[in-house]
Amino acid sequence: MKNTDFEQIYKKYHKNLLVYALSLCGDYDLAQSLVQATFTKAYLSYKEGGSLRFWLSKVLKNEFINHIRHSSRYVDDPDIIFERLSAPDNPLDILIKEERMREVAHGITLLPNNYRLVLMYSIYMQLKDEEIADIMNTRPANIRKIRSRARQRLKEILIERKWGDKYEEDW
């Protein structure tokens, strides 16, 4: 892989992989380490063919599983999942948007594992149902059903936590 190709791949996928890693481990430093290991493997061993996004997400998941095996512990309490968003003109808009993202991200962490994974793969990694089904060893129809149930449960969680007023119209 050429350095220029690698730089473009890094720029394109870094943020999504970081969010996905944060959803898995809940630790920003560990998430950065997992993403770095993923890109190192991509640089050293990726061969053309197939979906690069799918391949990167699978490598990241495997890196996380390897980390769990080696450390024998799982952290499931993320304080902050999203980095600062690109700054709009109004600082108040920044704060509102970041707070809303944190609330939704925290709500996602409260979902059952299979719901959380399907949402993370769908929303943040933007994988197709078939790719998610391959990762999770199920059928695409099941992925659609799980995603629908996950969105409904997330809405319920947000409403239960008194965040519902501002989310009612979005769903």
State what each model feature region is.
Residues 19, 33-40, 44, 50-62:
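Structural recognition of an alpha-helix C-terminal capping motif at a helix-to-coil junction
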Residues 51, 61-78, 97:
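Arg/Lys-rich amphipathic alpha helix in sigma70-family domain 2
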Residues 136-161:
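DNA-recognition helix of helix-turn-helix
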Residues 13-14, 23-24, 120-127:
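Short helix-capping/turn signature of helix-turn-helix
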Residues 159-171:
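Short, basic, alpha-helical segments at the C-terminal edge of helix-turn-helix-like DNA-binding modules
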Residues 109, 113-117, 125-142:
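Helix-turn-helix DNA-binding module
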Residues 1-19, 23, 29-32, 47:
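A short, charge-rich alpha-helical start-of-domain segment used by transcription regulators
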Residues 82-109:
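Acidic, proline/glycine-rich intrinsically disordered inter-domain spacer in sigma factors
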